[in-house]
Amino acid sequence: MNLKEVFDFYKGKRVLVTGHTGFKGTWLSRILVNAGAEVTGYSLNPPTDPALFQMAGLEGKMNSIIGDIRDLAHLKQVFEETKPEIVLHLAAQPIVRDSYKDPVYTYETNVMGTVNILECVRLNPCVKSFLNVTTDKVYENREWEYGYREVDRLDGYDPYSNSKSCSELVTHSYRKSFFADGHCAISTCRAGNVIGGGDFANDRIVPD
């Protein structure tokens, strides 16, 4: 699929992006805005100063809502008001080192936060597609020379990686339990490490 096909698909669609103030979420939101989508973002305040979200010029070009995905009541309100057709779930506690410092917050955000988003998807038939963006850290680390496959075992052991493995299991459970008839497409994708302009977070491979 080329960029024109992406733009044609998203033009005019109501899209909810969780984690829109983060690095990946900001770039994704900018692409969607440029494609002509009606974008709503739901996230904590930008995690860095300077913040890519402000630098990208997205304020005023999308519906930016500051909130915590652990807050189910607020999420329900947002879904009811915005009626998204597509939900792209990127919000997370994303730092391995921070997960050792505060594992409870990491699990609450990455596991129960995902449950909350999926529950809102379940309750709102306007949603036709949900994507949970996780990480390549979900795999059991076998220390082998070749790349991991989608069918390889999940066994992230640190709190961050494990919470993302759990997030995938939650997504799988909801897909089998509530969306087996296909009225809403439920999927996950596993992102690797990324680099790019505006990445000011700690512990990055190439920080800006």
How would you name each of these model-derived features?
Residues 1-191:
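N-terminal Rossmann-like NAD(P)+-binding domain of SDR-like oxidoreductases, especially those catalyzing
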Residues 124, 165, 182, 195-208:
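Glycine/proline-rich active-site loop of Rossmann-fold NAD(P)-dependent oxidoreductases
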